[in-house]
C-alpha cells in the first residue's frame, strides 16, 4: 500500500511528556502556530489534545517543521493536557493515559489521466476511495507511543495493516541534551524524521492507475509492511542523529514466510546518520542511510540475492516572502549480487547495480497553497534477463533508465483537507524515450495527470 498519511501522525497522536523540557517544546509549537496563522484552525485529534493546529508540526502536510520532528523523536507522547494518572498505588500499579481519543481516519479520492491509455483499459480512471485508513496512535505510557495504520486500498479491494511504528523514548539530564529510544516498526525508514527517505518522501500521494518503472532499490518499499524491524536511536544535543536497526521478514497473511515470499535470509541491518543545524531561521540536514539484505527469491535455502543500498540525503528549509521554501534530495545506490536469480537463468549477470536520484522543492506561501516541483532519475546495469521485453512494463533494450519530473499544486481550504493537481512527465521509461517496451509505447505515453482530494479527520 502506498504510504501517505504523515499528516495524521500529528493530527491524531496523543502524547504525554517524559521531558522536563516540555514547556520549551510547547512554546516552540505555539510559536510555529502563531507564525503560520493557525490560532483558530479546526483540526482532528492532535488539536483536541494540544490546542494546536496542524501548522505547529507541518509547514503544510506532510512536510514537518522542527517541532514536528521533535514530536516524532520523543515517541509521539508530548502533550500539554492533564493525563489520567495513578502513581505508586498500594498494589504497585501506575498509569499515565491520555484522556483524548487516539482514533482518526484518512480518505483519498482521485482521477487519473494518462497521455495514452493502457491497452484494454479505460482512461480517466476514478477511485473513491483510493485509500481509506483508520489510525490508532498516541501515548501508551509516559515514555511509549505508537503510530499504527489500517488501510483499505480501493484499486485492489484489499484491507490490511499499513505502517506501524512503536516507540520508547527517554532523555538524559546534563549540559548536553540526549534523546534516546527504541523503535519497533514494519517498514524500513517509516521511523525517519525527515521527508527525504522512501516512506515519507515526495510525492506524498500517487496512483495505481499509471504504470511505474521496472526497477527500484530494495529500500524503496520492497519490505514495506512485510518485515519487522527493531532498532535503537539517539539525538545528541539536537545536532547528531544516529540509528541502527535490524529487520526480519514478517509476511502479512502468512504465519511464517514461505518459499515464494521473498524472505530475508536471517536479518537485514539498516542504519541512519544525520547532522542537522539551524542558521538563524534557515535549517539544513545532511545525512546518510542504508541497508544490506540477502533474500531468497523462490526457495528458503541455497543461493540468495544480496543487495547493499547506500544513500545520501539533504533537506533545506528557509523563510521567503512570508512563506517557506523546503528543498529535499536523496541519492541511493544499490549493489546487487544476484546469485539465485543468475543460477535460475533470470539474469544475464550475477553482479549489477542500480541508482536513484530524487530532488524536489516546495514553496508554501501560506497555509492554503503549496507549489512543488521535482526531478527523478533511475539508472543501472543493462540486463535483458532482469528487464525483458514486455508491453508497457518491459524494456526493449534491458535498461532500467527512467527519468522525469513531477509538478504539484495544492490548495488546502482547511488544514486537514487538500485538493491537489499533480503532473508526472517522463523523458525516459525503462530504458528508452520511444518504443521503450518493444510494443510501440513511448515514454511520454505514460505522462500522468492526477487530480486528488485528501481528507484527514
Question: Which residues are covered by each model-predicted region?
Answer:
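Post-cleavage N-terminal segment of exported redox proteins
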Residues: 1-40, 63-106, 278, 297-298, ...
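The canonical Cys-X-X-Cys-His
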Residues: 51-61
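Outer-membrane beta-barrel "beta-signal"
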Residues: 53, 417, 443-457
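Outer membrane beta-barrel
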Residues: 62-66, 98-114, 119-252, 265-281, ...
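Outer-membrane beta-barrel and related beta-rich outer-membrane complex signature
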Residues: 192-200, 254-256, 298-300, 339-343, ...
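Detector for outer-membrane/organellar transmembrane beta-barrel domains
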Residues: 281-407, 411, 423
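C-terminal beta-signal and adjacent terminal beta-strands/loops
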Residues: 415-419, 423-442
